[in-house]
Amino acid sequence: MKLISLISIVIFSSVNAQSFSVARVHYGGGGDWYSDPSSIPNLLTYLEENTPVSTINEDIHMKLTDKEINQYPYLYMTGHGNIRLTEDEVISLRTILMNNGFLHADDNYGLDASFRRELKRVFPNKELVPLPNDHPIFYSYYRFPNGLPKVHEHDGKPPQALALFDEDRMIVLYTYESDLGDGWEDASVHEDPWPIREAALQMGVNIIYYSLTQ
């Protein structure tokens, strides 16, 4: 999982002329949208330290109906429990994603059923499709020939990367049975060994890079 080329660095740098940031989605329904609070700052720190990208490495969070959310084309959603979007939030998320926005949803174990249900409300005529291991997202910056890394075992199922597309553009990436966010957390939280945490962080870089250059 090494850097694939100097060309990628140049492209990444030019795409991110301004500081890159992520907005965590504050959703309703009772689920812990705030879980893994150190994950996004750690991912953005890793991104800045290992690529030419300048970042705002803060845990920025807002609701889908907040006006400021339009300043953040890269959205992140995670949690262990239920998600319930209001009708206004459904419309807002659909509008953001259809206007060059991108959502990475990471199941932190327990999010799956409600996320799929709410995504169907946002895009009733679109389906999540599994990404093969040779998809460009697994090679966009670091190499993952075996696809999505697995951080925590949970039910012992293989990790899955599923995506929703608008024509050829990926607008939603859903990482399931992988728990990338736990891998981005401070080492003391889960006490995962560094190789597992590093794989999660590098996959996070790939996701960001792919979303910006597709």
Region locations from a protein language model:
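Sec-dependent N-terminal signal peptides
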Residues: L3-S13
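Stable alpha-helical elements in mature extracytoplasmic
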Residues: S39, L43, E89-S92, L111-L119, ...
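Acidic, glycine-rich loop-and-strand cores that form catalytic or ligand-binding grooves
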Residues: R117-L148
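Aromatic-Pro/Gly-enriched surface loop or interdomain linker
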Residues: A17-Y74, T78-G81, I171, D179-L180, ...
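Surface-exposed patches in mature extracellular/periplasmic domains of secreted proteins
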Residues: V53-M62, A105-N108, K126-D134
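Short alpha-beta junction capping motif
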Residues: V22, Y74-A113
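Short, surface-exposed beta-strand/loop micro-motifs that present aromatic residues
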Residues: L64-T65, G156-V172
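Sec-exported extracytoplasmic/periplasmic mature domains
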Residues: E48-P52, M98-G101, K120-P124, L212-T213
